[in-house]
Curated annotation (Swiss-Prot):
Organism in which the protein naturally occurs: Bifidobacterium adolescentis (strain ATCC 15703 / DSM 20083 / NCTC 11814 / E194a)
Its job: Catalyzes the last two sequential reactions in the de novo biosynthetic pathway for UDP-N-acetylglucosamine (UDP-GlcNAc). The C-terminal domain catalyzes the transfer of acetyl group from acetyl coenzyme A to glucosamine-1-phosphate (GlcN-1-P) to produce N-acetylglucosamine-1-phosphate (GlcNAc-1-P), which is converted into UDP-GlcNAc by the transfer of uridine 5-monophosphate (from uridine 5-triphosphate), a reaction catalyzed by the N-terminal domain.
Subunit structure as annotated in this protein's UniProt entry: Homotrimer.
Gene Ontology CC annotation, any one: membrane
Example GO biological process: UDP-N-acetylglucosamine biosynthetic process
Gene name for this UniProt entry: glmU
Name of protein: Bifunctional protein GlmU
GO molecular function per UniProt: glucosamine-1-phosphate N-acetyltransferase activity; magnesium ion binding; UDP-N-acetylglucosamine diphosphorylase activity
Cofactor: Mg(2+)
Record family assignment: In the N-terminal section; belongs to the N-acetylglucosamine-1-phosphate uridyltransferase family. In the C-terminal section; belongs to the transferase hexapeptide repeat family.
Main location: cytoplasm
Catalytic residues as annotated in Swiss-Prot or TrEMBL: H368 (proton acceptor)
Amino acid sequence: MALSAAIILAAGEGTRMRSNKPKVLHTLAGKTFLNRVMDSVAALDPDTLAVVVHYQAERVAEAARSYNEHVTIVEQDDIPGTGRAVQCAMAQLTQKDDLDGAVLIAASDMPLLDTDTLDQLLAFHEKSGNGATVLTTILDDPTGYGRIIRDSEGNVLRIVEQKDANSSELAVREVNTSVYVFDAKLLAEAIANLKSNNAQGEFYLTDALEAAKANGAVGAFAAPDPLSVEGVNDRVQLAALAKAHNKRVCEHWMREGVTILDPDTTWIEDDVQIARDAVILPGCFLQGHTVIGEAAEVGPYTTLIGATIDAEAHVERSRVQETHIGRAANIGPWTYLRPGNELGEGSKAGAFVEMKKAHIGNGTKVPHLSYVGDADLGEHTNIGGGTITANYDGVHKHHTTIGSNVHVGAGNLFVAPVTVGDGVTTGAGSVVRHDVPSDSMVYSENTQHVVEGWKPEWER
């Protein structure tokens, strides 16, 4: 059905989160609550997507705009309540257009709200011919939620907020999810005369349903998946919801042919892609747009952030950010790959190696205790332990180039900018300050001095 507008309510503080940032900017599986709801709603292709802000308004508005530049920002005034939020939104939206069709309203603190559930809600609303439809769910513990009160025939009479409910109403387990569909014109009429005569002194959007009943049927659609409409009020709820969601994500990948040895300690964000026969060992965090190839092995205790791991590569006990690791490469343990690296097929970055903006050729090995930054290394080169590319002069970063088939001795220091040609051998402890031609050897003249019988001053 035609969706004239979608209004996302993001004005609240979320005091129970006990946070210095608005609740809607907290994250689940790598995305803020607000962005997750915006994704689901935008997929419905509304004519207008609006976000209502108030607490830390500019911060929330900027987060919304940076995620979707086409969003309309509505600032709620100091009059509290969800009803007032929708009044402000409708006043702004109807200044531009005469809304004609359906208006979807959704809270922004349901991070798992999905497009499929919203599609079903819209279809039910249209098929039923309702003037307004509320999305509901059944909870074992409905504490904190508005209760759906029906008559003996199952028709929706009203929604009663927790603080305004009597004992019989508190026993109701069907609750309001704070997602609604209204006929646009009916909504405009229903919110025009909202009053704040309730325990909270707020303008409740739920009161608009009672007003709407005079001009059109009010229905309720129960969400098929309660998890999709579960709200977050505090960090305890957030942790529980994140765990439940992550369990589903892990189960999805296991059914796709991925081995996850311990789903309870493996965390996988939504944008991660994993090929079949990959193996994920315990204690792994897979984040951002990470891609893991066929038969690759990750872990244990590894964090991948926006990394690409090609087939048959092995990454153990390491942190990898925005790095491409080639086929059958071997990373770790305790390797730190910062953004911008490209490691070739069969390459190695071993224990206590750090890399940044390094291009490592096929078969090249940096086995241990080294820093390689702003550098190009050719193919089948071996870097001795304790080697450093000194790339920073205090103001600018400089580049190091080391060719193919180079043997670098232990404890070398390359003072960039410097280029070492193909087939070079460097002596242990060398400090390489100047370019080295191909097929040569370079070493530093470090004279060893021995002082016999020497003792420190305090022992003399």
